[in-house]
Amino acid sequence: MNVIEVEDVSFRYGNSREYSLRHINLEIRKGEFLGIIGPSGSGKSTFCLTLNGLIPHSIAGEFHGNVIVDGLNTREHSVSELSTKVGLVFQNPDSQLFNMTVLEEVAFALENLGIERDEMWRRIRWALKLVRLWDKREEFPPNLSGGEKQRLAIASVLVMKPKVLVLDEPTSQLDPLGREEVLGLIKLLNKEEKITIILVEHNTDFLLEHADRIVVFDKGRIVLEGKPEDVFENVEFLRTIGVKLPTRVKIGYELKKRGLVERAVLTRDEVVEVLKWAYLRGKS
């Protein structure tokens, strides 16, 4: 069952002659983990903005096509209404945090929706425990670490109970520990909470391991789509457009060029076994 349907969507910002999105068609299944990759400026972030109605309602430009979210056409419904269907998390958590405490930050959106007090507290407690910030609920958000800030930004979206969580490079400004915390949370939300995940991420190693499907953007178009192991077999093409390859794909590709394997995308165990075999053969 599809939770999002994107139908022939094109978009051009008001101050630009060029289209940032060109004839995008995509169906996203309920519960799916979709990874989005592509070079800078390829349209990934713009695409994310179409999924919760910021485009066309809040961002000026020329918009064509339709985005259907859980049966609602984004043209016909407000951003506030769509926010209960699709939650959006940006690169920089500081741009989304502006309250005095962690608790107030998470409560803010619910107060604006007029949620009953008992239900509001149930959601706040659930979200903060899920992102492991309940014990820091009285903290001043700027005092949190980078990973904690991003987890707080995610919690402030989760309390809306969206069916889909869209994350636009949420780890790009984090240190290794912060990245690990946020990516671990994203896995949990998909596997345990059954939330549909749409993740724009340069960490292709993570996407190869955990995404159900990957979409590749270039110059405003979808140029590749499929299972991670199928997408990453297109090594030369991905290198040509500037996509970072997963580590074991780079290793597998070099082994393939040497005639040691038939495909570039290998499991971790396969990489170890082939390297071990090549090493032993070299010693004999």
Curated annotation (Swiss-Prot):
Function: Probably part of an ABC transporter complex. Responsible for energy coupling to the transport system.
Gene Ontology MF annotations: ATP binding; ATP hydrolysis activity; ATPase-coupled transmembrane transporter activity
Subcellular compartments: Cell membrane
UniProt cross-references to CDD domains, sorted A to Z: ABC_cobalt_CbiO_domain1 (cd03225)
GO cellular component labels: ATP-binding cassette (ABC) transporter complex
Family stated for the protein in its record: Belongs to the ABC transporter superfamily.
SUPFAM superfamilies found in the cross-reference section: P-loop containing nucleoside triphosphate hydrolases (SSF52540)
Binding site for ATP: G38, P39, S40, G41, S42, G43, K44, S45
Family annotation (SMART domains): AAA (SM00382)
Stretches assigned to the ABC transporter domain: 4-244
Organism, scientific name: Pyrococcus horikoshii (strain ATCC 700860 / DSM 12428 / JCM 9974 / NBRC 100139 / OT-3)
Name of the protein described by the UniProt record: Putative ABC transporter ATP-binding protein PH1815
Domain of life: Archaea
Entry's EC annotation: 7.-.-.-
Annotated keywords: ATP-binding, Cell membrane, Membrane, Nucleotide-binding, Translocase, Transport
Membrane topology per record: Peripheral membrane protein
Main location: membrane
